[in-house]
């Protein structure tokens, strides 16, 4: 991936990363016995979009990464950046690590997300800021106004 990035072959790198992450995510879900039914992909507009999701469990992220048909990153808690193997793939996906405890840093992360959108990358955001314990949307983080 590094060589493709250095050679400026970003689209090729993105295609390889997206395919690898989709395959990994789908295998993980299958091994866990999760059956996924996807409806409505045809309703997602072309180009960069922001996917807004509540975050109810451990399989939300693999489901989104496995079944959304375009390269996209996640706005993720900064703690995820400390996990070596995951960190590398998240960076290639265009993930942005958000410090929920530091408003200035969080605003910079959101600006970074805006720049990614302008470059044509979609982003997934979990505006509640953490996994929810119910099927109801919780309060959004104060920095997120959608």
Outline where the language-model segments fall.
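Membrane-anchoring hydrophobic helices of lipid-metabolizing enzymes
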Residues: 1-49
